[in-house]
Amino acid sequence: MVGVKKLQVEEWTLLIDIPKTKDVYEKIKYRNDMVEWLNYMEVCSFQDPQVLAFFENLGIDILKPSQLSYYPVEEGTMMIYTGSYHLCAEIVEGQMDGWDLVIAGHCFSLTQEHNAIPQEMSGNILEISFEVVLPWLLDLSIPAK
């Protein structure tokens, strides 16, 4: 299996098809112009190097979450972002329900919901859900929910 690599993430071993995952993310062309999404994209350009390396090691484009929700906090100066990304992979060792990982304030979990899987993705698919509180960087005010 060319391009498939074993990756150790704490006590879990994942078998990831990096080229296939990257190819799927390259094909995703959607763009969302809601200001909450635009702020997420802006903040991602200044992400912690550990977070960026985590996504790069999985073959995921951090700017293209499969699903993204957001809630203003701290009087509109911060946003709680939750969502998911998908990758062409499977768990080789470790329990699905025990996979919780915190990297630079980002909480990641493997989930079984498999919501909003990119159409181009097939085969073994893992969903990584996340939650993070990020600053509001745009010069626009946060829309009321």
Where are these regions (language model features)?
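Long, hydrophobic N-terminal alpha-helical segment
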Residues: V2-S45
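Generic detector of low-complexity/intrinsically disordered segments
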Residues: V9, I16-D17, A89, I103, ...
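Generic structural motif
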Residues: W12, N39, E90-G94, V133-L137
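Short, well-structured hydrophobic secondary-structure segments
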Residues: Y30-I80
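Residues in well-ordered beta-strands of folded domains
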Residues: V35, C88, S129-E131
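Amphipathic protein-protein interaction modules
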Residues: I62-N124
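Glycine-rich, aromatic-bearing surface loops/beta-hairpins
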Residues: T111-K145
